[in-house]
Amino acid sequence: MIEWHEFSEERRGIDPDERGFQYGDGLFETIAIRQGEPRLWDYHFRRLEAGCKRLALKRPAVAALRDRLGTAIAESAHDSDSCIAKIIVTAGVSERGYGRATPTDPTIYVGVFPATPVNQPAYEKGVATILCETRLAVGSPVAGLKTLNRIEQVLARSECLPTGAFEGLTLDADGRLICGTMS
C-alpha cells in the first residue's frame, strides 16, 4: 500500500476539481530509495523541472521538494533501505474545461511504497517478454514526459499480465522500438 503525503497549504485529500484527477494534467517521477536516499535525485528533479516547464506548470523548488521527499521517507512505515517514492505534481484546482485560463497553484503528492525486488534468477537467465500490440503515439508534444495520462502504457502493460510476461516492449506507430512497459 502506498502512503501518500500531500503538500498543500489549503486542503487534504484529492479535490474532485483537481486537474490531475480530471484531465491527467500533471507529471510524476518514480524514484528508487536506497539507505533512505533517493537514487539519481538530480536526474529525476531535472526531468520533473523540464516537464513542468513544457506543461507550463509552476516548478517546485528543489530544496523544498527534496525536504518533502525526506519527510515522506522518514514518516513511512516501509523499509527505507529499499523502497520506492513517487512524486506527483499536478496543475492543481482550476475552472472546469481543458484550458487553464488562470494560473494555478500546483499540488504536490509524495507516495512511498515497498520495492518489489526482481529475483536473482531473472538477473542470471533473463525474463519473458512480449511485443505489445498497443502502439505509442508518434510526434506527441508530451513524448518523453512522465505525464499523469498514461493510458497507452496502461493498455500495453495490461497485455503482459495474461501472458505471464515480465516485460512488454512497445513500438510507436511507425514500428520503432520505444520502451518497455516498466523500463
What are these regions (language model features)?
Residues 179-183:
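Glycine-rich phosphate/ribose-binding loops and adjacent secondary-structure elements
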Residues 1-169, 173-176:
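Conserved alpha/beta cores of soluble small-molecule-handling proteins
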